Amino acid sequence: MAVKTPFLKLLPLLLLLLHFPFSFSTIPLGSVIYASGSNQNWPSPNSTFSVSFVPSPSPNSFLAAVSFAGSVPIWSAGTVDSRGSLRLHTSGSLRLTNGSGTTVWDSKTDRLGVTSGSIEDTGEFILLNNRSVPVWSSFDNPTDTIVQSQNFTAGKILRSGLYSFQLERSGNLTLRWNTSAIYWNHGLNSSFSSNLSSPRLSLQTNGVVSIFESNLLGGAEIVYSGDYGDSNTFRFLKLDDDGNLRIYSSASRNSGPVNAHWSAVDQCLVYGYCGNFGICSYNDTNPICSCPSRNFDFVDVNDRRKGCKRKVELSDCSGNTTMLDLVHTRLFTYEDDPNSESFFAGSSPCRANCLSSVLCLASVSMSDGSGNCWQKHPGSFFTGYQWPSVPSTSYVKVCGPVVANTLERATKGDDNNSKVHLWIVAVAVIAGLLGLVAVEIGLWWCCCRKNPRFGTLSSHYTLLEYASGAPVQFTYKELQRCTKSFKEKLGAGGFGTVYRGVLTNRTVVAVKQLEGIEQGEKQFRMEVATISSTHHLNLVRLIGFCSQGRHRLLVYEFMRNGSLDNFLFTTDSAKFLTWEYRFNIALGTAKGITYLHEECRDCIVHCDIKPENILVDDNFAAKVSDFGLAKLLNPKDNRYNMSSVRGTRGYLAPEWLANLPITSKSDVYSYGMVLLELVSGKRNFDVSEKTNHKKFSIWAYEEFEKGNTKAILDTRLSEDQTVDMEQVMRMVKTSFWCIQEQPLQRPTMGKVVQMLEGITEIKNPLCPKTISEVSFSGNSMSTSHASMFVASGPTRSSSFSATRSFQTMGITSSGPASTRISEGSMLGS
């Protein structure tokens, strides 16, 4: 009896402990935690994760969740009031109840022989039977988040409000609004089979999201987190309530801020983001929601995302209906939308047909050359996007008179003025070019046509020598002969292989044999003509071309020194580049790209800026090569959706792999990486002990923040007294501005030249990848809804798929970057 008495005294204490935190992950039957109980939780063995109640945004409500670091939910059961509880019942069912006793959520495992629960070090919450076999798991029943080591298989769905994310059987990743409208459809590269049997998605410890399946050896890499490479970082993939899918990460596995490093889509392209009749646009930093005009009011002025409502319903118009014109605005639709239809019509008929039809509430006229007109019928959900580069005008039926927003009237006037200015500039440039060609032909006719020196040359070679700007057309046999059957290989890249050749007039040339070029004869010649019309000191000159049968070749001037990478990354002391050479190469390259972007008749986006495509002449002046081989952009809209983009990982801007439009700012990003390599002498994607196993660009920014810029400098230059540290600082600052995640945070190449030359003061740059505008702090999450783009990966590849299926009135969408920050923000006043 003396032995039993102490045990009986301890029994109440043991029972009490069932209601309080455990040191181990095992959770016995009968355990309970209360919403009102401070510090009550069921922790994982390493205390990284815990099951607990965290405050909800709604007042006096709490979310029952598995949390990271005690405050960041990665799985949730639901929300209850302060008297709610989460209990593992003796029946084996895990149940969340409100203070009134109402069941909010139930695991429905009361007949599965559950004997205990457990929260693992991976963040998985499981219920076990008497054989320690899981019968229920939070990983198998995800809510809005996927963590590392969690397998997300086809058929599972993440949900957040009206939005959902799922992995299709085909391997595609989709984001949907209200289960019907697919506004993001990210597919596998066409080289993979679309007939997958059981694909699974996984967020790897290095920050790469991959799809695995028996038919995919090694898996297919889908997207990269902006801080990929560091396996000591905790990351998770979350569907936020704004409809965007983001990758978050924390540098600490136990605490600290959680930042977003990638998001799936431009925020204004999220279907329904601004509610019914809401129009999404941007201010300097964030997406904003507005009504189409003053004929509408906000449903809730305190929450503009709830949409708008008509001040006067169409049924009360008494025949006084008219059309509200919204320029540069696109109302969204989706595939198989039952409340919309399309046909071919011009802008005026598209507007008039809708006005006269009782079944039409709005229409959209595409001004992208397609001639499409889309009509929205009663029952439609109206959600749209407005930005100056959007190639469409939307018409919304309203009760007259139209009361337009001030911003819309100003935009329309500015648009008309800009069109007039563009016409004036275009006519002047064309007239100047025609005059120059006429003078050159006249000079040749008068002075050179009878010169015997040209007697043995064909008319093509005569044109080569004396009519600069007109490319010479070679036959395939001529180029085969001058390269000795393509014997001496100079290099290879994403567009083909380069060979050394000697023309009959003894001119040494570089002959590029193009691969994967599918354009027809006429289109190829037009692009060659455009490339050959570009003349700049820092561009490699195109001499001629061959377009014969399936053969497509380009002939360039020859650079004996080869490309920049031969000097920058070599250990050969004979090829060492002094600081003066490096700075001049950086400046020359910037000037060459500026010419392509801002001074050509057509904006030429290079799409593959890297050291291998920067050649060095005998005087070590930079010559940019391979420009114009990607699609030329419309000067009125320098955005382009590429279905098979080419580039080199490590230099690709985040928007490439995020399926967002490619612009001239994508070249700026690539140039920024090259700039950092010129300073450091190291590849931007190098990971080593010196960089603490971080990507070099991220490590370099951390050293810059510490004021240790000299650590970034090439060690071979560290003892060189001739190094201009002011130039080093300008190059480093400029490089970090160039590699900002958001395209409009990056400077134009014209600004880059000014920054390098010291014409303008450069403000300290923002962290290019490690600091995000979406972050968790304490128990709450704050977001500016800035879209975080995917980062380029550490290895090279020549081709990526960039197809997109989200349709905006039937046309593939091409929205702008989500964060609208003025380029002036990086420059001093």
Curated annotation (Swiss-Prot):
Intervals, Cytoplasmic compartment: 443-829
Name of the protein described by the UniProt record: G-type lectin S-receptor-like serine/threonine-protein kinase At1g34300
Keyword ATP-binding: yes
Signal sequence, start to end: 1-25
Residue span(s) of domain Bulb-type lectin: 26-140, 143-260
Domain named Apple: residues: 317-399
Catalytic activity: L-seryl-[protein] + ATP = O-phospho-L-seryl-[protein] + ADP + H(+); L-threonyl-[protein] + ATP = O-phospho-L-threonyl-[protein] + ADP + H(+)
MF-aspect GO terms: ATP binding; calmodulin binding; carbohydrate binding; protein serine kinase activity; protein serine/threonine kinase activity; ubiquitin protein ligase binding
